[in-house]
């Protein structure tokens, strides 16, 4: 398994994962909304998305959004989204994604 920053060519498979993530939170399936949202994030660079992949298949993702800390007077990243496909759970994917976010 490899964890890396998402790239534009990940748009389609990442959109499917994001749609699954939203369905997990009881939102109706809506691949167009998922694709539009993820496409905007990838194109605008206003979030950092890490993906876990194995043999070319995306297994999960985590998405971080920028914020600022007044106390430390610096930028920080808020982990807002973490999702692992049902078929890839209990295999360390979530842990690897969390580690990538922490290291960022």
Each predicted region: which residue ranges?
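Conserved donor-binding loop and adjoining core beta-sheet/short helix segment
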Residues: 62-75, 80
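A short, internal acetyl-CoA/4′-phosphopantetheine-binding micro-motif in the GNAT/acyltransferase core
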Residues: 82-89
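A short beta-loop-alpha structural element at the N-terminal edge
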Residues: 2-16
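A short helix-loop-beta-strand connector motif used in the catalytic cores of GNAT acetyltransferases and
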Residues: 39-51, 78
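Conserved acyl-CoA
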Residues: 85, 96-104
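Conserved GNAT-fold acetyl-CoA-binding loop/helix
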Residues: 15-40
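Glycine-rich acyl-CoA binding loop
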Residues: 52, 90-95
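Conserved beta-strand in the GNAT
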Residues: 51, 57-66
């Amino acid at each position: 398994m490899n964890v890396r920053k998402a790239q534009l060519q990940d748009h389609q498979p990442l959109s499917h994962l994001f749609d699954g993530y939203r369905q997990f939170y009881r939102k109706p399936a809506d691949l167009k909304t998922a694709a539009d949202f993820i496409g905007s994030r990838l194109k605008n660079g206003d979030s950092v998305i890490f993906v876990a992949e194995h043999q070319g298949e995306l297994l999960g993702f985590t998405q971080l959004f920028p914020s600022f800390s007044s106390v430390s007077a610096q930028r920080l990243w808020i982990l807002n989204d973490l999702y692992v496909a049902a078929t890839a759970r209990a295999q360390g994917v979530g842990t690897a994604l969390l580690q990538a976010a922490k290291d960022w």
